[in-house]
């Protein structure tokens, strides 16, 4: 199991879109509980976090602070797993601090996923790399859906050759498919389908879509 971090495993405690500081964080317990269910039912052996952390690259926070946040979340997941009797799981994390969109580690590039799959391959005797790909599920919150800033998580999974679910689907919640299909994020902006016509709003948010 591979997870994006911000917006997927954690959210801001303040309810804001962006964290006020490093303490403005709340673990999404429903996501963790669903992950624990899968770990218990399917014998998951690896729980990993892969996350772009560009704030480090621009000097807003330190890599030590980000590592502390992510390791805290992994420790919480580990402790909850042990309480359920789930043992033998390896917990790992990979972050990209770069602001270079061509960095192979920066999502939507698949470098961090490749590293995680390589770690799984080393710990599983008799399993091929292709087997690891087939058994891996990545969960994220940048799927190109309405209200999301990007599709970088989804594209990353596709490039890496692993299955992908948006965190909403991971929780078993239904998406409004008519709404989703009417508004799609692309590298050019948001595509709106209306009366058999296609309209493209070029980057309406005025920010880099990171695709």
Report each predicted region and the residues it spans.
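HAD-like aspartate-dependent phosphatase fold
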Residues: 1-211
């Amino acid at each position: 199991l591979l997870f994006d971090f911000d917006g997927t495993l954690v959210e801001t405690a303040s309810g804001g879109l962006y964290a006020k500081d490093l303490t403005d964080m709340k673990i999404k317990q429903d996501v963790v509980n669903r992950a624990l269910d899968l770990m218990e039912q399917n014998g998951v052996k690896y729980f990993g976090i892969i996350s772009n952390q560009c704030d480090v690259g621009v000097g807003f926070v330190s890599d030590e602070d980000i590592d502390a946040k992510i390791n805290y979340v992994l420790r919480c997941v580990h402790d909850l797993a042990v309480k359920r009797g789930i043992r033998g799981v390896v917990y790992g994390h990979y972050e990209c601090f770069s602001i270079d969109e061509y960095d192979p580690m920066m999502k939507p590039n698949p470098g961090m996923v490749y590293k995680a799959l390589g770690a799984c391959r080393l710990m599983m005797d008799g399993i091929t790399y292709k087997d690891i790909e087939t058994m891996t599920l990545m969960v994220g919150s940048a799927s190109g859906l309405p209200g999301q800033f990007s599709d970088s998580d989804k594209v990353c999974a596709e490039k890496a050759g692993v299955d992908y679910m948006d965190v909403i689907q991971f929780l078993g919640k239904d998406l409004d498919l008519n709404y989703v299909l009417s508004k799609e994020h692309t590298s050019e902006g948001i595509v709106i389908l209306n009366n058999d016509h296609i309209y493209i709003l070029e980057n309406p948010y005025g920010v880099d879509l990171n695709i």
